[in-house]
Amino acid sequence: MKKSYFKWGAISKRQAKVLTWWKKGSRYASYNGIIADGAIRSGKTVSMAFSFVLWAMTTYDHNNFGMCGKTIASLRRNVLGTLKNQLRARGYTATERRADNLLVVTKGNRVNMFYIFGGKDESSQDLIQGITLAGVLFDEVALMPESFVNQATARCSVEGAKLWFNCNPSSVTHWFYQGWVLKCGKRKLLYLHFTMEDNLTLSEETKARYRSQYSGVFYRRYILGLWCVAEGLIYLQFAEDEQRYMIPQAEVPKLSYIEIGADVGGNKSNHAYVAAGYTAERDVMYVLKAWSYKATGVTVTQYRENLIKFADGIREQYGFVDTIWPDCAEAAIVNELDAHSPYNIRGSIKEEILDRVRCADILFSQDRIKIVEDECEDLCAGFRTAVWDDKHDDKPLDDGTYDRDVIDAFDYSMTPHITQLVRG
C-alpha cells in the first residue's frame, strides 16, 4: 500500500456535518442528498469527496458510483489526488485505472467502483447513459450542463442512492440554483452554505490574499459565496481610478514575451489590435499599445497590412514580437497572415469569456496590470464603458454601444499566459 501524506487538521461545524449527515442516527440520514455551495477555499471539496466515498463504502458493496467534474482532467486535479491520500490514511486501498476512468476502493472484503465522468457540454450526457449507479458526486456542478446532470441523476436507481453536489455560485437565474438550491426542501436535500471561515486551515493572511483577488460580481460569488447577477460596469476598478494603472513607457521593464491580439470586426464594428508584454515571471501584464478602427470597407489585404504595421512599431520600440494571435474564427484572416506575414501567426486561444473577465479582474484587483499611457486610449475607452448584458447571464453586452472588439483583442493578448497570470 502506498504511504499516505494526508493529515486532517481542525474541521469546522459545516465540514463535520458534511462528514456525518448520512450516518445512522443523524436527523438527515433519510435525505436524498446534499448541496454544499459557497466561497472558494472554504473546505467544501475536501470534505465532500471524502464523505461521499466513506458513505459509499459504509453502505454498499460491489456497487457502481459516479464522480463528475467539468472535465476528467479537472476532477483528477482538484479531487482525486487528495482523496486517494485521505482514503489511504484511513486504511482503504484506492487504485485508479486511468484507461478505464475508474477508481477502485477496497477495504477488507468490501469493494466499490467509482467511475469518473466529465460534464463539459451537452454531448457529455451520452457518456453516462446505460450505467446503474448507487450515488453520484458532482464537483463544480454549476459548470455542467443541465442535461448531463439530469442524465446522471437518472442513473441512480439503486435503493438508497444519494446525490452529492458542490459548487461556487453563479447567477441567480442559473438552472442549478433555480431547480435545486431553491427547491432543496422539496427535493429533500441537505443544503450547506460555506465561507472561507469554514476552512480552519487558512490563515488570516491567506484569506486576505484571496479577498484581494476579486471585485464586483466575482467578489460576491467567490468570496462571499453568493448567487448573484452580473450587472453594471465590468471593469469597475479601472473605471473608478484608471490613473492607478497607467505608467510611462520608460517604466516598462525588460520583457521576455510580447503577444499581439488581433480582433476582426464586422461591417458595423471595429478591427482592433492590442500588444501586451510580460517579464519572465509572467506575474504582471504590461499593455504596450492598442489600436481600434472602423472595419467598414477594409479588405483582408488592408487588414493584414495594418496589423503588420502595428507589429512593426512594437518590434521597433521593444525589440521583438513573439506571436500575433488573430481571431481564430476568421480563417481567411489567419490564412492571409500566415501566408504573407513575417511574424509567427497562431489562431487566438478563446478561453470562456467569463474566465477572461475573471483573469482581468484579478489583475486589476492586485495592481498586476500596467497600461502604457498615451498608447492605449482605445482600450481604456473600452474598459470605461464595458457593461454586462442584463438579458443574458454572465455575458458582456455586445450591441455596438461600446468597443467590444478592442477588449477581445486585449483578451487574445492575455490568454496565452492566463494560467500563470491567475496564479500570480
Region locations from a protein language model:
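Inter-Walker segment of RecA-like/P-loop motor cores
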Residues: 76-133
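ATPase catalytic-site recognition across NTP-hydrolyzing enzymes
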Residues: 199-265
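Mg2+-dependent endonuclease catalytic cores in nucleic-acid-processing enzymes, primarily RNase H-like
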Residues: 284-397, 420-421
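Conserved P-loop
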Residues: 31-101
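ASCE P-loop NTPase helicase motor core
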Residues: 135, 143-213
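Catalytic acidic motif of RecA-like/P-loop NTPases
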Residues: 73, 142-143
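Pre-P-loop entry segment of helicase/translocase ATPase cores
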Residues: 1-33
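Short beta-strand scaffold segments in enzyme catalytic cores
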Residues: 270-277
